[in-house]
């Protein structure tokens, strides 16, 4: 093992690679960055928030070579002891993170039709990393695996059985790495025993989902076979009546592909407001009296509150509601509106704590009189991926997650 081992965390998206390098001893981030515009002439690399530098080679392999060169410039290349990959979809095959072997790669490829935009990019990242870092243990961490503890009644759709049996049509859930990290931190913050606890975690960002966590395990979540189901999001519709879309198709002669683009790219906050998918823009418009921005936010909040309350029904007891993700951590307005909707559950807001900036870190934002504790816990998916790699790679883990 290296004297100063580090973990390289790689998240290959459909056109980007986000990466970070963490000290294996305490998971402190040593460097991070993004390569974006992959497979286009505009491909660039930005390290530690610096100026974007054009990439000479636009492929995933070319981008990872450029990332490896940045590590080399900082004398970190030879210290890479482990590599953790975020994998979008593990299907029902992967119930936990796994050391990457030929068999694991084959199984990732088998389930890749469930998430073609992301899984094939993930595989490109794995193959390139194997060439650049030969002999380094690599670990796959799946966005879906945390939710594989859901019971059949939570993951089945009310469709003919053959679609589940023959095609694997069922609810898988996403954001699992975030929900797992945040629920683990919540046990510490709220002083709960992991084997006797009930939490609802709201991961709110441009993509958003709710997860019910009972005794440390996911028992229900709002996203489904794809990330489209559940909450209204930045550009995704969330739950929508299939009959409504069928009627739209008949009236507009749009194809299934057209409608898929509409519900994924043109709906949600953007669709209702007609203004933006960025909540920061909509909050500014909210305060300026923009009616459709206000309506978009109210609809967003209504869906969040309804799903939080519904997911609580999957718990034996509701100990806490946790906000995380870019919006959940940073928008005091959204948290306030959601908590006001949840007064029926005994939620009461502590206005002063709710209004504190996210730099304050983990914090309880409900009042002392509340029957249900509400808290903000910043997510850290990179750290969770690194911790899984450390655990599977047999490196000493930081005490908080050992």
From Swiss-Prot:
The keyword Transcription regulation does not apply. GO terms for cellular component: cytosol. The keyword Metal-binding applies. Substrate binds at residue 86. Its EC number is 2.7.2.15. It catalyses: propanoate + ATP = propanoyl phosphate + ADP. Belongs to the acetokinase family. TdcD subfamily. This is Propionate kinase. It comes from Escherichia coli O6:H1 (strain CFT073 / ATCC 700928 / UPEC). The gene is tdcD.
């Amino acid at each position: 093992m290296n004297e100063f081992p580090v973990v390289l965390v790689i998240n290959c998206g459909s056109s980007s690679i986000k990466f970070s390098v963490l000290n294996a001893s305490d998971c402190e981030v040593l460097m991070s960055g993004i390569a974006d515009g992959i497979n286009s002439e505009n491909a660039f690399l930005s390290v530690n928030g610096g100026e974007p530098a054009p990439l000479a080679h636009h492929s995933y392999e070319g981008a990872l070579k450029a990332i490896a060169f940045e590590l080399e410039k900082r004398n970190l290349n030879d210290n890479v002891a482990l590599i953790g990959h975020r994998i979008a979809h593990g299907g029902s095959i992967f119930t936990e993170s796994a050391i990457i072997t030929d068999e694991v790669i084959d199984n990732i490829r088998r389930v890749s039709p469930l998430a073609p935009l992301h899984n094939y990019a993930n595989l490109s990242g794995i193959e390139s990393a194997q060439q650049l870092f030969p002999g380094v243990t690599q670990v796959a961490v799946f966005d879906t695996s945390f939710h594989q503890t859901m019971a059949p009644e939570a993951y089945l759709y009310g469709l003919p059985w053959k679609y589940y049996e023959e095609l694997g049509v069922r609810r898988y859930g996403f954001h699992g790495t975030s929900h797992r990290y945040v629920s683990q931190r919540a046990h510490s913050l709220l002083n709960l025993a992991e084997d006797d606890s009930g939490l609802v975690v709201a991961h709110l960002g441009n993509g958003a989902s709710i997860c019910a966590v009972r005794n440390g395990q996911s028992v229900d979540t709002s996203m489904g076979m794809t990330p489209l189901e559940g909450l209204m999001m930045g550009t995704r519709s969330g739950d929508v009546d299939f009959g409504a879309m069928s009627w739209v198709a008949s009236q507009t002669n749009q194809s299934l592909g057209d409608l898929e683009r509409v519900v994924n790219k043109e709906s949600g906050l953007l669709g209702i407001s007609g203004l933006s998918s960025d909540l920061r823009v909509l909050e500014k418009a909210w305060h300026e009296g923009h009616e459709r921005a206000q309506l978009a936010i109210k609809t967003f909040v209504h869906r969040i509150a309804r799903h939080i309350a519904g997911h609580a029904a999957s718990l034996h007891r509701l100990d806490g509601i946790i906000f995380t993700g870019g919006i959940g951590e940073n928008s005091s307005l959204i948290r306030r509106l959601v908590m006001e909707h949840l007064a029926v559950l005994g939620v009461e807001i502590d206005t002063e704590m709710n209004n504190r900036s996210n730099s304050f870190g983990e914090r309880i934002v409900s009042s002392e009189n509340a029957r249900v504790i509400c808290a903000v816990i910043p997510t850290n998916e990179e750290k969770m991926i690194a911790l899984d790699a450390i655990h599977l790679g047999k490196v000493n883990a930081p005490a908080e997650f050992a």
